[in-house]
Amino acid sequence: MCDEEVAALVVDNGSGMCKAGFAGDDAPRAVFPSIVGRPRHQGVMVGMGQKDSYVGDEAQSKRGILTLKYPIEHGIVTNWDDMEKIWHHTFYNELRVAPEEHPVLLTEAPLNPKANREKMTQIMFETFNTPAMYVAIQAVLSLYASGRTTGIVMDTGDGVTHTVPIYEGYALPHAILRLDLAGRDLTDYLMKILTERGYSFTTTAEREIVRDIKEKLCYVALDFEQEMATAASSSSLEKSYELPDGQVITIGNERFRCPEALFQPAFLGMESPGIHETTYNSIMKCDIDIRKDLYAFSVLSGGTSMYPGIADRMQKEITSLAPSSMKIKIIAPPERKYSVWIGGSILASLSTFQQMWISKQEYDESGPSIVHRKCF
């Protein structure tokens, strides 16, 4: 384990995308969809060197003849056979490494069930024979990536959004809140409101097009009502987008109506507070003495936090909820799409972290429950 040559592997498994690479790097080497596809009909692919399953981009490109499954739902692994396939693909096809030669740092969702952490640990040691491993909470890694150990993280990806208050490097479980509203829901919502404009997007292939429109053209309005008025009175907010078939569509108020659902979940028919209120509620569940530190360092992380305008809007909304004397700072690092992975890369390469790994020997002595004693 003291061998300097062997880089640790860092794997951040999200509901939508898997990010993987080597500790010490400043960005993940591999980023691919967290999907496993199986042929719908036996014998359709005879002579194509048919495999019984496909992972990631290959599954995505062959989706016409496959049944696609996401083994991670709302941040939590629900299908271990498929998850194992994703890890296998990560090590052998994407990173091209032998997992038995590298320590592996995995990430987990906040409030991940205990049994899940044990299962991850077991698969790493028993299936992949890793020499050492560690499981870290995603939001905590995002905070490390921003160079702090105390703050609140609003981590929003494809499948789930969490607000996680962290004090001196430890997530405070009683104050963590989960919102089942994230990127996938916003893509669905954009499909719906584009349909109202007369464009038809229904198939899974078309859904990918809408996701691209969302990522390229959507933004968060600072004042929603005012933006709606501007959009109604002029065409200044309209943008055009060329579909793969050459047809050009025009999109106006949909650009900011789509991500507005993060602040007004009622748009999606959900009776829950928006991301600003959820963040505030998380802070209010914490001890009164640390709230000031949380308000002063509120970090946005994950792919769904990438909309232009989101940080200014969060600043405005939280300022109106918080006590008037409170200093509020929203941090939105440019690389926040990958900040969980980056935090993992930083953590796994710290010299002080090297004694934190769970070794194969410790696992053999204690079994999977060792993870609760060493990773918290």
Swiss-Prot record:
Q: What positions belong to the pro-peptide in this record?
A: 1-2
Q: What is its main location?
A: cytoplasm
For this record, the Gene Ontology CC terms, alphabetical, are: cytoplasm; cytoskeleton
Q: Which GO terms describe its molecular function?
A: ATP binding; hydrolase activity
Query: Do you know which Pfam families this protein is assigned to?
Result: Actin (PF00022)
Q: Which family does it belong to?
A: Belongs to the actin family.
Question: In the UniProt record, does the keyword Nucleotide-binding occur?
Answer: yes
Q: Where in or outside the cell is it found?
A: Cytoplasm, Cytoskeleton
Tell me which species this is from: Saccoglossus kowalevskii
Q: Which residues carry this modification: N-acetylaspartate?
A: D3
* Catalytic reaction equation(s): ATP + H2O = ADP + phosphate + H(+)
Q: Does the keyword Nucleotidyltransferase apply?
A: no
Q: Which classification does the entry list for the species?
A: Eukaryota, Metazoa, Hemichordata, Enteropneusta, Harrimaniidae
**What is the name of the protein in this document?**
Actin-2
EC number of the protein: 3.6.4.-
Highest rank taxon of the organism: Eukaryota
Provide the alphabetized UniProt keywords: Acetylation, ATP-binding, Cytoplasm, Cytoskeleton, Hydrolase, Nucleotide-binding
Role description: Actins are highly conserved proteins that are involved in various types of cell motility and are ubiquitously expressed in all eukaryotic cells.
